[in-house]
């Protein structure tokens, strides 16, 4: 199983909320991604991987977005199961069960979109994981999606469990995962809830990142 501990005293740049926004909201996703990239360049950390936020319809309704959005996960915020993950007492510390993929090869930009079959063929390992979500925005989870994108997809940290070999394509929708804190179930997930299956969410993320890089 996966486990983590959240303790206080983390540096402000990694978790402290802004008291005010730096300006008007980005007018569109493209500008929000550009702001996300600028923040990524200034933080001085190493980009390790990407998350795909709001893949569930329930989450999309809660955050008033019509689809998922990517966010960076830094090497400094990527942990193995059992690690101590530092947070501030003011952080939301929202924990969500996730499925993570490591890739055996890159998916370069091309004219036609990558198919689900092609994306799965590039997967090396599949991991149960826990994402710690923490908006740094003054309004928290009550802002426009462009600010969520700019705020690194609201990611604070990702905790990875042991990896397994890729599954059969039809099995990803059946994956179950849950988060318990101090023995109490906090949240549970089913693969089919993530855009119809975690393999579809993975393909969506790949397409988003390729489009953003164009």
What residues fall within each predicted segment?
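A conserved acidic, glycine/proline-rich C-terminal tail/linker
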Residues: 198-214
């Amino acid at each position: 199983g996966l486990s983590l501990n959240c303790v206080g005293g983390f540096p402000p740049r990694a978790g402290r909320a802004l008291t005010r926004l730096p300006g008007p909201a980005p007018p569109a996703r493209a500008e929000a991604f550009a702001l996300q990239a600028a923040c990524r360049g200034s933080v001085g950390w190493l980009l390790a991987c990407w998350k795909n936020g709001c893949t569930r319809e329930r989450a999309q309704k809660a955050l008033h977005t019509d689809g998922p959005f990517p966010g960076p996960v830094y090497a400094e915020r990527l942990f193995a199961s059992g690690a101590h993950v530092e947070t501030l007492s003011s952080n939301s510390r929202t924990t969500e069960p996730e499925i993570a993929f490591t890739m055996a090869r890159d998916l370069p930009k091309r004219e036609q979109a990558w198919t689900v079959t092609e994306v799965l063929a590039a997967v090396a390992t599949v991991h149960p994981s826990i994402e710690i979500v923490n908006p740094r925005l003054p309004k928290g989870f009550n802002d426009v999606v462009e600010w969520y994108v700019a705020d690194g997809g609201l990611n604070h940290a990702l905790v990875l469990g042991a990896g397994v070999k890729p599954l059969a394509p039809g099995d990803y929708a059946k994956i179950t995962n849950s988060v318990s804190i101090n023995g109490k179930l906090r949240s549970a997930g089913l693969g089919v809830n993530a855009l119809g299956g975690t393999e579809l969410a993975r393909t969506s993320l790949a397409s988003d990142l390729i489009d953003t890089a164009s």
